[in-house]
């Protein structure tokens, strides 16, 4: 479960929750009931009911469902001539009367399947004018909740006397949003959740790229800046009505969250304290600072600064990197001190050893990082390089040149050294950068960010590299596809997979590092031992560490293999066996071949030959880095040609799969994708291309006056 956001900590005390379901959530585009969404809603209510929450539903949708049904009945009962006549709009009250029974029948059926009882309560605004009605309503609901029955409210539109625009002079309620707010007050709810067809309240129409979600509504800050779009496609008031109801309810003491009824398990996420949707709370103005800089503003500022950086000469950009390297070494003691505080806190918090290992800045690491930055600085300037030059026609020359991508977002867990690597690569490639690190490395990241940005000259601006330390969730950053050009996740399989599934922004990275070493029957076993020990023990938490050792079946009982296995055990490596190795050597059975240990553990299995090894790698590997140890060059070439991984080695440790070791300078990460960049990615992975055409007034004019030559020209 995600950690509770500080602004949502009140959910720990929530017992009674009212959930209002909008028509757009209950129904599909064609007006029919959205069975999947309603079913998912009922499953969440069931789970809450089982956990001891008191859940009250307020549902819309009767009018829409009834209208669809009556239109169908009218269609099947009409002649062709009738259908040619102007069609009168169906009476909304009749639609409500027909739709309500169908809507409740669905709820009743779904809840029965979940072994939950539900009840229907239809009300009108005039009912609430009677104090005795209110008293009886409360008693009835209390009785239902005591019996763990789900009360389902809806306005009785079939007999309501209110006319458009649906706001009565009494101001009791005017739609189901305001009904939900009224019930929250009457029934003393601890929380009101308004489910919509959008993620929450935006600063403008959600379809506009410039609109940003508002996670905590503050009247003084947001009332004037919000621009509402169209109202709901099927309901009465859309977001305007929800905000009005939310403000009234929250001012009366009931917190309100507006969130999407389309998102998976959104209700449970709200009650787990996740920062989704928009929160309305009477104390919100005490939490949020109006001076907070949004991540969107940080991204825009980073792009502006990157353009200043690109305007510098190659030597000026080189000097910035050299200054950064010097600054890191000059501040090593301070950096190590802050990192040690992070490591100590992680150990006290009980973090797993692999994460603590990745978090730790070991002695010599700062010097190593500074060296890689200087190597990067002394490499050929990657920006504005002419990659191709073509004479399109006489005096019409086309150049394909390298240029920065724009603004990068790196989301990383624990690894503070990743911040340094990415920052230096961003500077060298002329890109702006946003950094979102894990809370476990907050002190390390903060000091590293300060040291680096202090070395950036004023004519570029320290906002070139932004460190996101606000409570913004990763999900919010991933929605900034109009201002962020590439996401680079550095962390767990779960983190990378979630990011790839949650954004329109291109993602560069790998979800798994399941690297193999295959020992062929002709291998030099002393060499194999040397390679295997390095691949597993040198840095077990690294993504290029060996996770599976494949061995030719002829070596099963060989002294050389015994020597390797004993050496691994002596170093403290836990060995697990595949089906064959488990049976033959008695190792504990591996849970799965597709498993990244990231620790002192590995899987061993036997294969028939090199092709079997290749098939195993393709089936269970992650296309990261795989190695063969053999003295048979023909077998080696077969392995090198056929293994479809980002990096494939012969007689060399998988630990060589690294940008610095490849001579790329610092490393942005390792990509197992096939588009844009693959394998260890250096500065070239942060570049794109553009076309520059130089002419002398030529025009196309239907190609009448152009003689195309398309002749390749020297680059210089």
Swiss-Prot record:
A single Gene Ontology CC term: cytoplasm
UniProt xrefs under Gene3D superfamilies: Acetylglutamate kinase-like (3.40.1160.10), Aldehyde Dehydrogenase, Chain A, domain 1 (3.40.605.10), Aldehyde Dehydrogenase, Chain A, domain 2 (3.40.309.10)
Activity regulation text: Feedback regulated by proline.
Induction (record text): Induced by salt, drought and cold stresses, and abscisic acid (ABA).
Residues at which substrate binds: 60, 157, 176
UniProt KW keywords: Amino-acid biosynthesis, ATP-binding, Kinase, Multifunctional enzyme, NADP, Nucleotide-binding, Oxidoreductase, Proline biosynthesis, Stress response, Transferase
Pfam families noted in UniProt: AA_kinase (PF00696), Aldedh (PF00171)
Keyword Amino-acid biosynthesis in record: yes
Known function: P5CS plays a key role in proline biosynthesis, leading to osmoregulation in plants. Involved in abiotic stress tolerance.
UniProt name for this protein: Delta-1-pyrroline-5-carboxylate synthase 1
Organism from which the protein derives: Oryza sativa subsp. japonica
Organism taxonomic ancestry: Eukaryota, Viridiplantae, Streptophyta, Embryophyta, Tracheophyta
């Amino acid at each position: 479960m995600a950690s509770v956001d500080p602004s949502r900590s009140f959910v720990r005390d929530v017992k009674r929750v009212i959930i209002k379901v909008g028509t757009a959530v209950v129904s599909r585009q064609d007006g029919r009931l959205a069975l999947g969404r309603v079913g998912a809603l009922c499953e969440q209510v069931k789970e809450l009911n089982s956990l001891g929450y008191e859940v009250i539903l307020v549902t819309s949708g009767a009018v829409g469902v009834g209208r669809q049904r009556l239109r169908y009945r009218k269609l099947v009962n009409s002649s062709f001539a009738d259908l040619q006549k102007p069609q009168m709009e169906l009476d909304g009250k009749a639609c409500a009367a027909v739709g309500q029974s169908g809507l409740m029948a669905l709820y009743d059926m779904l809840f029965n399947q979940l072994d939950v009882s539900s009840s229907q309560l239809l009300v009108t605004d005039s009912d609430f004018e009677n104090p005795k009605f209110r008293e009886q309503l409360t008693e009835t609901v209390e009785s239902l909740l005591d019996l763990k029955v789900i009360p389902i409210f809806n306005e009785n539109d079939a007999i309501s006397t209110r006319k458009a625009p649906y706001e009565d002079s009494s101001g009791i309620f005017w739609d189901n949003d305001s009904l939900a707010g009224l019930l929250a007050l009457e029934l003393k709810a601890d929380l009101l959740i308004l489910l919509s067809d959008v993620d929450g309240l935006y600063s403008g129409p959600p379809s506009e790229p410039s609109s940003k979600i508002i996670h905590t509504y503050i009247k003084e800050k947001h009332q004037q800046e919000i621009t509402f779009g169209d109202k709901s496609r099927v309901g009465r008031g859309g977001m305007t009505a929800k905000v009005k109801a939310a403000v009234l309810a929250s001012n009366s003491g009931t917190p309100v969250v507006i969130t999407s009824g389309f998102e998976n398990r959104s209700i449970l996420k709200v009650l787990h304290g996740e920062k989704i949707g928009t929160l309305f709370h009477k104390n919100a103005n005490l939490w949020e600072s109006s001076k907070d800089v949004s991540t969107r503003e940080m991204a825009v500022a980073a792009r502006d600064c990157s353009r200043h950086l690109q305007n510098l000469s190659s030597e000026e950009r080189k000097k910035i990197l050299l200054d950064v390297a010097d600054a890191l070494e000059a501040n090593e003691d301070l950096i190590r001190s802050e990192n040690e505080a992070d490591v100590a806190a992680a150990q006290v918090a009980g973090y797993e050893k692999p994460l603590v290992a990745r978090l730790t800045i070991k002695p010599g690491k700062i010097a190593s990082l500074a060296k890689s930055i200087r190597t990067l600085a002394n490499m050929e300037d990657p920006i504005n390089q002419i990659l191709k030059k073509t004479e399109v026609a006489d005096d019409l020359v086309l150049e394909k040149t390298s240029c920065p991508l724009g603004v990068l977002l790196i989301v990383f867990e624990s690894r503070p050294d990743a911040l340094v690597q990415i920052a230096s690569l961003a500077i060298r490639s002329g890109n702006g950068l946003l950094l979102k690190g894990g809370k476990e490395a907050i002190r390390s990241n903060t000091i590293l960010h300060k040291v680096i940005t202090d070395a950036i000259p004023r004519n570029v601006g320290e906002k070139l590299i932004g460190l996101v330390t606000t409570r913004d969730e990763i999900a919010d950053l991933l929605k900034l596809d109009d201002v962020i050009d590439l996401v680079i996740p550095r962390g767990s399989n779960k983190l990378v997979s979630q990011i790839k599934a949650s954004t329109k922004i291109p993602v560069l990275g790998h979800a798994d590092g399941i690297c193999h070493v295959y020992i062929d029957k002709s291998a030099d076993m002393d060499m194999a031992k040397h390679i295997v020990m390095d691949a597993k023990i040198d840095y077990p938490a690294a993504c290029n560490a060996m996770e599976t050792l494949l061995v030719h079946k002829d070596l099963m009982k060989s002294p050389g293999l015994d020597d390797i296995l004993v050496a691994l055990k002596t170093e403290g490596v836990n060995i697990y066996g595949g089906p064959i190795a488990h049976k033959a050597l008695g190792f504990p059975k591996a849970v799965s071949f597709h498993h990244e240990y990231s620790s002192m553990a590995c899987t061993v299995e036997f294969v028939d030959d090199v092709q079997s090894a290749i098939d195993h790698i393709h089936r269970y590997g992650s296309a990261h880095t795989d190695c063969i140890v053999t003295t048979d060059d023909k077998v080696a070439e077969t392995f090198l040609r056929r293994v479809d991984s980002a990096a494939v080695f012969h007689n060399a440790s998988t630990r060589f799969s690294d940008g610095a070791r490849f001579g790329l300078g610092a490393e942005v990460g390792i990509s197992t994708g096939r588009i844009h960049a693959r394998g260890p990615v250096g500065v070239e992975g942060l570049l794109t291309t553009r076309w520059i055409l130089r002419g002398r007034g030529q025009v196309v004019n239907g190609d009448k006056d152009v003689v195309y030559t398309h002749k390749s020209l020297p680059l210089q």
